[in-house]
Amino acid sequence: PTFHRSRSHDYVAKEVKAVRENLGASEVASFANHKFTGSGARAFLDRILAGHMPERGRVNLSPMLLESGKLNGDLTVACIDDETYYLFGSSVAQNMHLRWFEKHLEGVDDVIYKNMTDDFHGIAISGPNSRELLSRLTREDVSSDAFKFRDIRDTFIGGVPALCVRLSFTGELGYEIYVAPQYQLKLFEEIEEVGKDLDVKWFGGRALMSMRLEKSWGAWT
């Protein structure tokens, strides 16, 4: 079977086509979420991450390295305000990263760390019509100039408090929306209802991997 296309091939192709040409949605369940707060949060993250730190309301992609220079993590770092930062990374490497954070937090008294993986449940929307869908779910201006690529904001989407970032692993226009677990079903239902006439289609992990490969997006776990 490994030398032939799987039986899921045609279904995956339909999901990819929906995202590429119109609009798709997917649960974001494969990321670990970490929160750092405090007056020393920025300096701490600037020390353990190899990339540039983002400005307020922005996100950057940043590697995390071992002392030897080897890759220890590929993370998305978000700056909510001067003392609040989120890191999104691999759920597979979550415990390894937790140990790394704890090791470097020893003796640091101006940073508070919290694992937020169980507190954040996400849904991603992607495709040419994703901005139209988002505009129907929120009262805020989500035009390209007002909500730029790699912008992040606390807002209300579908009537529930949410953290929204303009970022997509599909390589298409897209957004990731994170809410507390008790609001995820509400968000799901709102996307289904509001996106009905847009013909929103749900897509899975195989479609996501196919699309990110076609756009040369790397993956590290």
Residue map of PLM features:
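Glycine/proline-enriched, intrinsically flexible loops and inter-domain linkers
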Residues: P1-T221
